[in-house]
Amino acid sequence: MSNRSRRQVRLSRALGIALTPKAQRIFEKRPYAPGEHGRTRRRAESDYAVRLREKQRLRAQYGISEKQLRAAYEKGTHTAGQTGNAMLTDLETRLDALVLRAGIARTTAQARQFVVHRHILVDGNIVDRPSYRVKPGQTIQVKPKSQTMVPFQIAAEGTHRDVLPPVPGYLDVNLASLKATLTRKPEPEEIPVQVNIQYVVEFYAR
């Protein structure tokens, strides 16, 4: 297991969620926090600790920095409707998130790598910013020259679908063509992340 994989497994156990397929397998065997006292019952947590952990869980699932998550919160406070729902919808339209949801990548880290290495097109143009927000109607696709690479051939066979959640309703995916279209704005209840978003809002609003 690589150092990165080991860190992801440890973080998964600490946060109580599986962040990668490998972490999922290990988490099923050892569903408790890492360390000498991981099996023991947690002490009663403060309200602050509970909300901090939810914020960390959301950050980890999208693989983003504290600055990026706070920016999503600030944007949500200026959006009509509930701040938490606006945050989730905004984060879910990140390019790296949609590359993962489509099954083109196996993990968030791999999705980000594909984008940064200029393998991903949006409406035919290379976009190398994982934080790029995809708009409804836009299509993401693996660059034709990259489609012969082994990772993308594996994805085109649908291999990652066995370890990822079902494709959400806001994506129209053609894996054989390594292509996906965001058909509409994601609804918070259909976004496949594990988080109490209200706790995250309360953490930042304190």
UniProtKB/Swiss-Prot annotation:
Start and end residues of each S4 RNA-binding domain: 93-153
Subunit comment: Part of the 30S ribosomal subunit. Contacts protein S5. The interaction surface between S4 and S5 is involved in control of translational fidelity.
Family annotation (Gene3D superfamilies): Ribosomal Protein S4 Delta 41, Chain A, domain 1, RNA-binding S4 domain
Classification via InterPro entries: Ribosomal_uS4 (IPR022801), Ribosomal_uS4_bac-type (IPR005709), Ribosomal_uS4_CS (IPR018079), Ribosomal_uS4_N (IPR001912), S4_RNA-bd (IPR002942), S4_RNA-bd_sf (IPR036986)
GO biological process, one term: ribosomal small subunit biogenesis
GO cellular component: small ribosomal subunit
One annotated GO molecular function: rRNA binding
One Pfam family it belongs to: S4
Entry function: One of the primary rRNA binding proteins, it binds directly to 16S rRNA where it nucleates assembly of the body of the 30S subunit.
Entry keyword set: Ribonucleoprotein, Ribosomal protein, RNA-binding, rRNA-binding
Organism placement in taxonomy: Bacteria, Bacillati, Actinomycetota, Actinomycetes, Bifidobacteriales
Family stated for the protein in its record: Belongs to the universal ribosomal protein uS4 family.
Protein name stated in the entry: Small ribosomal subunit protein uS4
PROSITE patterns (UniProt xref): RIBOSOMAL_S4, S4
